Amino acid sequence: MDFDLHAALNDYPAYVCALESCPQPAASASPPTLKPASGGLVNPSASRPTTYHNLPSELIQQIGDYVPVQDVGNFSAVDRRTYHAMHSRRVVYRYWQRANQVVSLASVNQLLNEMDGTLAHPAQHIEPLEALRQHLDALPYHEQGEAFKRIYAAAQRIPKDGVQIQKALLLYSLPGFNWNHRDELFDFAYAMAQRRAPQEENVWTELANCLIFLLAGSAEFVERYQALVARLGSLRVSEQAELIPVLCRQMLGFGRRDDRLPGLYAVLREHALQLPPSHQGASIGMLASAIWVLPHAERLAQYTQLRDVALSLPDEQLEIALCFLSKGWAELPREHHAYGLQLLEPALLRLLPAQRAQSVLSQLEDVMKLYE
């Protein structure tokens, strides 16, 4: 099979070609020498297809960078030249294997220390760190908290991709800890997030999602919720647009009668209304669905304003807002339900047919719940 050089450079699975046999064209099939219009002869080698065995070692090394870490051993065994070209990837592969076999905090610390002294590029840490994260629960429970911190701190030193490991630790590893340990690890992650530069991707939305892993209604929950609300003003527009809807949803952790909710709602609403229309859909929609936190006398006016803002949004943001608007109807006087649905009908026509059908179905489900 001929090797496509262009595909090797641009297609993720190109390395698979090297794992297959690469037969050379038969001699009898060699094309005749062509004579161009200029009268010169074309170099026969220029017309031959490039095969894996013709590739320079530098290109093989580049292909190897796209090989999934679990396949590095097989790819390195293709031939001697590949084995040497894959040296740096084989080092990562060995650390990845060891990460999959850790059984104690001591083995985690030893591995991380060796990686710090051996791996030249921060990106080489990604695959072993992700393996450590996935095997965190293989450690004795009393050592898992410190291991969590070591892995989290190591990920902090990896530009761009390290934050993805941190997000996974928060969303998938933190729930495995007991209640009394989650507060400590949450605070550790929060402190690390504060150290990131403003232009860097961060974990504020994930931290807000993790509030559900804390004891609802507790002083610890309230304190951390308020800290995230207070950070909104310092975040980029895109970060605020992601964080506000999550904070709206996490108001459920307070309980419906908590007298702090109206004030927190007002802060979220103020920030949402200051977002550009290109980022408002989810925040406006979620705030409309969360009017239950307000006194009864204020709900209709607040909902009406948010609905009007939603209907003025660009089509893409309108589609997002419509997913939540009808969920606020349960908190409105019944005589406003039909009128509210009537107002949304023209907005539905602005959506693409598939999205329109989905939005109508969602609204009908919300209406049916009102009269069950």
Where are these regions (language model features)?
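Skp1-binding F-box subdomain of Cullin-RING ligase substrate receptors
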Residues: 39, 46-123, 127
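Non-catalytic tandem-repeat scaffold regions and their flanking low-complexity/translocation tails
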Residues: 89, 94-372
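Non-Sec secretion/translocation targeting segments of pathogen effectors
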Residues: 1-50, 88, 370
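Intrinsically disordered, low-complexity segments enriched in Ser/Pro/Gly/Ala and basic residues
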Residues: 20-21, 27-29, 37, 44-46, ...
